[in-house]
């Protein structure tokens, strides 16, 4: 979870951790939740959204999907920057 109430940063945890976090983020007056993800965690985010939509929150829809690429600094021992895919998935509660 993040400091922003309607943003979830997806990382290395299993998809079910995010499946439980998505309904919690809709508490109060939040009608939109955004999942921000990059790199190999994109598959985890997609799995979490699909599990949530089909099993627990039938009234959840995907509002917007934004894809892009970020330039990351080189790792130790590497001499050039690397490009990493990014994705933002906005979920809307109807």
Give the location of each predicted region.
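Charged, well-structured alpha/beta interaction segments
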Residues: 28-49, 53-54
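Structured beta-strand/turn binding interfaces of compact recognition modules in eukaryotic regulators
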Residues: 13, 38, 92-94
């Amino acid at each position: 979870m993040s400091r922003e109430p309607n943003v979830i940063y997806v990382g290395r945890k299993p998809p079910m951790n995010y499946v439980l976090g998505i309904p919690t983020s809709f508490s109060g007056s939040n009608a939109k939740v955004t999942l921000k993800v990059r790199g190999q965690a994109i598959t985890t985010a997609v799995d979490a959204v699909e599990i949530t939509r089909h099993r627990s929150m039938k009234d959840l829809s995907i509002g917007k999907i934004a894809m892009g690429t970020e330039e990351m600094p080189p790792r130790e021992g590497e001499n050039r920057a690397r490009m990493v895919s990014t994705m933002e998935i906005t979920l809307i509660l109807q």
